[in-house]
Amino acid sequence: MAKKSLIVKQKKHPKFKVRAYTRCERCGRPRAVIRKFGICRLCFRDLAYKGAIPGVKKASW
């Protein structure tokens, strides 16, 4: 789990736009964030298995 201070710091609008970075909206993880959904791969996997993300299903080929 991410530090509360870093989550709050990231939510503020940065002075320069290059300082902005993606962070998971659900758990606050800074790495492996899927931009389209705004959540990290771990949260994405969890929600996909539960069927909470419409149109996403497990791949099989």
Curated annotation (Swiss-Prot):
Binds 1 zinc ion per subunit. GO terms for molecular function: rRNA binding; structural constituent of ribosome; zinc ion binding. Its cofactor is Zn(2+). Gene3D superfamilies: 30s Ribosomal Protein S14, Chain N. The keyword Zinc applies. Keywords: Metal-binding, Ribonucleoprotein, Ribosomal protein, RNA-binding, rRNA-binding, Zinc. One of its GO terms (cellular component) is cytoplasm. One of its GO terms (biological process) is translation. Zn(2+) binds at C24, C27, C40, C43. Binds 16S rRNA, required for the assembly of 30S particles and may also be responsible for determining the conformation of the 16S rRNA at the A site. Belongs to the universal ribosomal protein uS14 family. Zinc-binding uS14 subfamily. NCBIfam families: PRK08061.1. PANTHER family: 30S RIBOSOMAL PROTEIN S14, SMALL RIBOSOMAL SUBUNIT PROTEIN US14M. Part of the 30S ribosomal subunit. Contacts proteins S3 and S10. This is Small ribosomal subunit protein uS14. It comes from Malacoplasma penetrans (strain HF-2) (Mycoplasma penetrans).
